Structure formats: structure tokens, C-alpha cells
Amino acid sequence: MPVREVSRLPELNEILEKSDSNRLIIVDFFANWCGPCRMISPAFERLSMEFGNATFLKVNTDLARDIVMRYSISAMPTFLFFKNKQQVDSVRGANESAIISTIRKHYSSTPANPNAASDEEKKFLERFVGYTELRKMHTDEVFKALARSVMPDGISDRLENGEDEKKVLQELLDWFKNDFFTWFDRPTCLKCTLKCTTEGLNGTPTKEEKEGGAGRVEVFICNGCNSEMRFPRYNDPSKLLQTRTGRCGEWANCFGLILSAAGLENRFVLDTTDHVWNEVYLKKEQRWIHVDPCENTMDRPLLYTRGWKKQLKYCIAYGHDHVTDVTWRYVFDSKKLVTQERVRQGVLENFLGKLNARQMAGATEERKRELAVRRVCELMGMMVQEAKNQRIGWEKLGEDMGGRTTGSKEWRRARGELGDNPEAQVLGKPIEFRIQNDANHVEFSYDVNRDSYSQTPEKGFVAQTFECNNIQRKVENDWKMVYLCREDGKKEGNISWHFNLAPLVATDSKKTIEKVEIRMAGIRKFENGNILIIACLGDTCMRIPASGNLTIEDPKPEVLKITVTLSGGERNQAFQHAQLFRTEKDDVAEATESMVVRVYMK
């Protein structure tokens, strides 16, 4: 875990008080003017990543005087070790081996309570709490009345009169998808009518946007007239009845309110790999079914794993009075679930149990018994369906399932949700540099943050590639990192760019190419991941080193080929263990140079 700086004694006391009795707390007392403190700091950061069940803290002795006085610190650096709220050891001086030895002396890799969440697990689990508030809005009587005012006439009456629930539900889906709600990709400028091609930047919600539940807003700048366009990410479903546009989050949120208004008991399902949908309880069939308003489909739970080729991790369903894990419904083989990846299964079950109890607090005893019986039946149904799927087989199950249909093709491709799409492999043309008069060099670049190139076609990492196979652009919103890696489940990914150097000297017989500089930023390998980057020019090939920098002197004016192969890695996250262009996710206007090819002429 990252090292945390503590500035006040009450803050430190709270950490010690709340920590698990088996958790080791290490506090580094430092000063900015202290040379040994600066020397040992990188090692302290490294140790914080190595020992997961320990908390690493730093205290600036020039600022946190109350902590310094409490522990009588007189020399820097000093390291104090705490366990079960008590100081158990200390190390004075920048002695890395002594620090490691002391950590190992007191360290325990497991919490005293095996189901107690670690700090990292707590951070991950926090995301599940907010959606309980969302479901309360779906049961608001005023909101439901507003929803009924825009719905097709007679829906609720038809359900009350016993009409087939699935038939009515399909009509609702068709209406919502085709007549009511729209997909938001990028806006069209109201002034010059040009389609915006740039990514939205993070903006600050206005007072009005906040009143509609917008915690964030995407700001787009028109390429033609520089007009600003805003896309508030509204969470208030009644506001969405007015705006009637959004991405999957807005679709599932608004449709959840529509379902409640129609009298259909429903759940909001969150998938932590960035998709949401709904579930509806069919009273006659006594079962929950999958419903996706974006795709206008229902009762096709394997759509994501089999159709989109999406690797689901956690699927959590939120009813208005309960919360439950429904991941099994949406995977082909539960034995291969990767739910141990971010949080231990026992910790997840313990957390969801407490969250579910909180949601059920106002329910009657009769309702609680009903939910308990439903849950048992639901688990049995999942097991029976999985056995049936295994008999049918993976290939046959995919015959009526395709990739994702909502969103631009570039957006779906970047998310790896095109399914069995033959366009996953792209064969392009060699890139030709823009030649500027009086310039002694030309250059070409790619920015992984913006996912754009320096010349047209600009948008999407695939746009300028000569070949691209099994590669995706991965955005880690929780860690705020972005990079290229291979698609989940693929053993190898390849991407290449070809550059035609001949036109640079074709019009002037006296001009020659002096050198080519190549820079590939953010080359990262983890857990036995492999990255091979080769630059070929004519009959000569060179390996680009781990630094990502290569200079080719006196190159021939032929086709320069840069080829990247990503492979290796360990366990379920192997596809992420070889990363290209890894950088911090940044929403500011300045570009980042993930790849630069610069050609100098003489």
C-alpha cells in the first residue's frame, strides 16, 4: 500500500485504535533537510508494497510536533513499530537491513480476524456502498409518478390484470431503447454542428448540475469553433427522465425507475469491470432474469462473457431492500472465477452480509423470510443453469450472441467488447510524415491519455497501426493509470506501426536522412510479463531496450517497422503484466508523449 503521511497525533491514535491486532504499523519520523531520511525514503516506499498486511506511515518532525513530543523523537530518521495499539520496537538511523529484520520479527501476513478487510480491501469495497442510496430513489413515489407520466399508457394496468410479464417487459425495453433514451458518445456542437472528436475533460459541476445528482461532468471542446459542451453524469433518475441520454450507468439507472413505476420488482446490477444493467423478478416463474436496456435484451446472462468476451469479476445486485452477489449467473464456469483478485472471498461475503442487513433494516419479518427463500432458490437455479450451460458447450452458447452494439466502434474496440469481430485484427498502411517547409525534422506521436495521434486519423490507438491483434487500451480509474496491454484471456498481443521514410527525400536529391529517434514511454513488466519491441529498417532489425529509446544513424529511406509483442504474466491478471505506454491518467489539456518517432534530415 502507498505510504501515508500523518500530521496530527489524533490522526495517528485513530489509526492505531482501528487497526487489526495482527497488523503491524511502521512510522517513519523524517525531516526534509535530513540527508539519510531522503536516502532511505525509496526503500521505505518499496517495503510498503512488499508487506501487504502492514501500514506504513510518515511523520514530518518539523510539522507534527505533538507526535514528536509524544514519542520523544530526537534524531532522524527514527522508525517506530506498533502492533495491537502498543509500541513493540524501534530502529534509529537509515539502516535498511535493520528495518527489514524488525518488520519480519513482528509481521503477520494474515489479520487476526480472517474476514476483516485490509486497508486496500476497504478502499475497494467502499465503491459498493453508494449504490444503496441510488435504489432508494427508484422507490420514491414522486419519482415513480413522474416516470409513469412519460411511459406508454396502461403498462401497470396490464401487469395488474395478469398479462404476461415477459411480453410487457419486452415492450418496455423496445420503447426505452428505440423511442425514449439515447446513447451519448460525443456531443455535436450546437453552433457549428461538427461532431466533437476529442475526449471529454473532467470539469466542476455547477450548482444546477449538482442538484441533478451530478458528481462529475465531462467537458468537450469543439474542434471547429472552440465552443464548450458539457455532459453532466447525473445520478438522479428523475433528472434522467428529462435529459434522456447517457451511457450504461444512466440507462440502467433511469430504466430501474421505469421498472419500479411499472410495478416490476427489479435490481440494479453493478459489474466492477465497468458495466451496469438491471434484473427483474418474474412472479409467475419465481426467478430473477437479466435485463439490459442498452442492448434491448433480456434473459441472456452470458451475453457479456460469451458474446462480448468480457472478463467479469464481481456482479453485485441491489434491490430496494437487499444486496446480493450474482456473479455466478453471468459466468460460464464458476470454478474459474477471479473474485479472489481484489478482495478475499470471506471478506467480500462478510461485507455484503453487513450491507444486506443494513438494507433490510426496515423490512417486515415476512419480507425477510421471503427474501431468504428466494435467495436459496436463486443459488440453486444458478447451479442448475451452469450445469446446463456446460452440457450445451461454450461454442454453441455463442451462436446467438454477438459483441456489444451500443457506443462507437472505436469505444467498444478500446474496451475489448466487440466479441468475435473479424476487425479485431487491423492491417493498415505505412504512415507518411507531415512535411513542413524549412524544418530540419519531422515527428509523429501518440498520446495514450487522450488515445490520439498527432496526425489524422487521430482518434483511437488502432487508427494508425499497421497491424493490431489482441490489444486493448486499459484505463484503471481506481489507480488512475492508463496503458496498452493485451486483451484478457489472450496469451499474446501484437501491435505494429510502419513509417514510410522515402517521401521525406523524394523531392530533393541533395537531402538525406541523418537519423531516426524512437521513444516508447511507459514500458512496464510485472510477474514474469514479457515485452519485445523490435525496430526494423530494410534488412536490419534492432531491439528497443527497456528504456524505450533507440537512435538509428544514417538510415536508408525505406519503411521503418516498429513491432511490439506482449506476452507472459501470472495467474488471472497475466494480460496486465506486460504494459506499454503506462502513465498516470491525466485529464488536463497538456499532451503526453507515449510514443514519438522523430526523423532528422540534412
From Swiss-Prot:
Cofactor, free-text remark: Binds 1 zinc ion per subunit.
**Catalyzed chemical reaction(s):** Hydrolysis of an N(4)-(acetyl-beta-D-glucosaminyl)asparagine residue in which the glucosamine residue may be further glycosylated, to yield a (substituted) N-acetyl-beta-D-glucosaminylamine and a peptide containing an aspartate residue
Q: Which UniProt keywords apply?
A: Cytoplasm, Endoplasmic reticulum, Hydrolase, Metal-binding, Zinc
Q: What is its biological role?
A: Specifically deglycosylates the denatured form of N-linked glycoproteins in the cytoplasm and assists their proteasome-mediated degradation. Cleaves the beta-aspartyl-glucosamine (GlcNAc) of the glycan and the amide side chain of Asn, converting Asn to Asp. Prefers proteins containing high-mannose over those bearing complex type oligosaccharides. Can recognize misfolded proteins in the endoplasmic reticulum that are exported to the cytosol to be destroyed and deglycosylate them, while it has no activity toward native proteins.
Would I find tRNA processing among this entry's keywords?
A: no
GO MF term set: metal ion binding; peptide-N4-(N-acetyl-beta-glucosaminyl)asparagine amidase activity
Q: Which CDD domains match?
A: TRX_family
- Domain of life of the source: Eukaryota
Chief location: cytoplasm
Q: Which Pfam families match?
A: PAW (PF04721), Thioredoxin (PF00085), Transglut_core (PF01841)
Q: Name one GO cellular component term.
A: cytosol
Query: Which PROSITE patterns does the record match to this protein?
Result: PAW (PS51398), THIOREDOXIN_1 (PS00194), THIOREDOXIN_2 (PS51352)
Requisite cofactors: Zn(2+)
Q: Which InterPro entries match?
A: Galactose-bd-like_sf, Papain-like_cys_pep_sf, PAW_sf, Peptide_N_glycanase_PAW_dom, PNGase, Thioredoxin-like_sf, Thioredoxin_CS, Thioredoxin_domain
Annotated EC: 3.5.1.52
| Name this protein carries in UniProt | Peptide-N(4)-(N-acetyl-beta-glucosaminyl)asparagine amidase
Q: Where is the Thioredoxin domain?
A: 2-130
Q: Which organism is it from?
A: Caenorhabditis briggsae
> What residues sit in the active site?
248, 275, 292
As recorded in UniProt, coiled-coil segments are: none
One GO BP annotation is: glycoprotein catabolic process
Protein's cellular compartments: Cytoplasm; Endoplasmic reticulum
Residues bound to Zn(2+): 189, 192, 222, 225
Gene assigned in the entry? png-1
The PAW domain covers which part of the protein?
400-602
Database matches in PANTHER family:
PEPTIDE N-GLYCANASE PNGASE -RELATED (PTHR12143), PEPTIDE-N(4)-(N-ACETYL-BETA-GLUCOSAMINYL)ASPARAGINE AMIDASE (PTHR12143:SF19)
**UniProt record similarity statement:** Belongs to the transglutaminase-like superfamily. PNGase family.
